[in-house]
Amino acid sequence: MILTELHLHHFRNYQDLTVHFNPGVNVLIGHNAQGKTNMLEAIYVLSLTKSHRTSNDHELINWQEKSALISGTVEKSIGKIPLELQFSSKGKKAKVNHLEQARLSQYVGQLNAILFAPEDLSLVKGSPALRRHFMDREFSQMSSKYLYNAGQYRTLLRQKNKYLKQLKYRQQTDRVLLGVLSDQLAAFGAEVIIARQHFLKHLEGWAADLHQEISLNKESLRLEYVNQLKVSDDTTVEEAYQALFKLYQDNEQREIEQGTTIYGPHRDDIRFLVNDKNVQAFGSQGQQRTTALSVKLAEIDLMKEQTGEYPLLLLDDVLSELDTIRQTHLLTAIQNKVQTFLTTTSLSDVARQLINEPTIFEIEHGTLNKEEVK
Ligand SMILES: Nc1ncnc2c1ncn2[C@@H]1O[C@H](COP(=O)(O)OP(=O)(O)OP(=O)(O)O)[C@@H](O)[C@H]1O
């Protein structure tokens, strides 16, 4: 898919801007604090309805204003689709084809974007929460069912945890309601677990090939889904539900004593194995970076496989974080395949040579100038 046009109105430091993009590589270049990341963020928000930098939508609205608008046209194999998001103190409204969507979950999936920022290089060495967030964010874009199930799971988890605390401090005594909450939680949790198993298996296939290539055939990569149920590719949702519900029943007293839910996909993780060794514990920084890069690039192919369309790729200041070999791999892997937006304060010679006919936009104080490419 291609984002042909973007319009920003009172979004962050952009007053009123309409920009037409290159279907290939778009370079957003400028000094610090001019609005490069804000532009990538706008595309990301147009894709997922929320920002990767803040959970407070109000921050997206220009400080002098009361509302903001992001709109754009996405071109897919089925045709052109106009998308629009409005933010105000009353909340946000999402429109597809000029029609307001009753639920944001109906909107997500129209425009898919993969964001790669320097912090993604710590996907491997960062906390398990980072990897769970990664799974939820990426798999939600590929499957509205996943988005729904993960959302329901989160809501029920909050309810169950609140109830467990009330039982712990004896503000409640009725365990029947706890059983009902655990039953529902196990049902949505099982859906999330089986979907993660499925998506990670496919992601592994793509990532292993890329990793081998980037490491010049020296390393093999495997991805293991770490979960308390130890599911395999053959485990059904029903089996996972039964197993998870049993864990809740068997550990009811422990969960009450701890005032929190101990089992479920909110405790999952991903283990990355390079040449069969856990790269988080034993890998060099370079191996960890190669792993993160392979996994990010693999997402592009996974998304194409699952949705039939390539996503957009948003690269926020990552080139400067990668050495020449990894830069070369990244840039050759995306050329002529995915529409790419990359921010940088200066483009290295390597990148200039590798990028095919980019459009270069110079950003200064929330305005854009197109640079003629020499
Ligand atoms: N809600 C807002 N209203 C107005 N201006 C904002 C708002 N939010 C952020 N800004 C301004 O946007 C600018 C930051 O833009 P951005 O994060 O895109 O920088 P950048 O060009 O990516 O820089 P760097 O290279 O340092 O990452 C800052 O000047 C900040 O003050």
UniProtKB/Swiss-Prot annotation:
GO CC, sorted alphabetically, is: cytoplasm
TM segments? none
Q: Tell me a GO biological process for this protein.
A: SOS response
Keywords for the protein's UniProt record, in alphabetical order: ATP-binding, Cytoplasm, DNA damage, DNA repair, DNA replication, DNA-binding, Nucleotide-binding, SOS response
Task: Name the predominant localization.
Answer: cytoplasm
Annotated signal sequence range: none
Any Pfam family matching the protein: SMC_N
Select a single GO molecular function from the record's annotations and give it.
single-stranded DNA binding
Q: Where in the cell is it found?
A: Cytoplasm
- What does the sequence similarity comment in the record state about its family? Belongs to the RecF family.
Protein name per its UniProtKB record: DNA replication and repair protein RecF
Biological source species: Limosilactobacillus reuteri (strain DSM 20016)
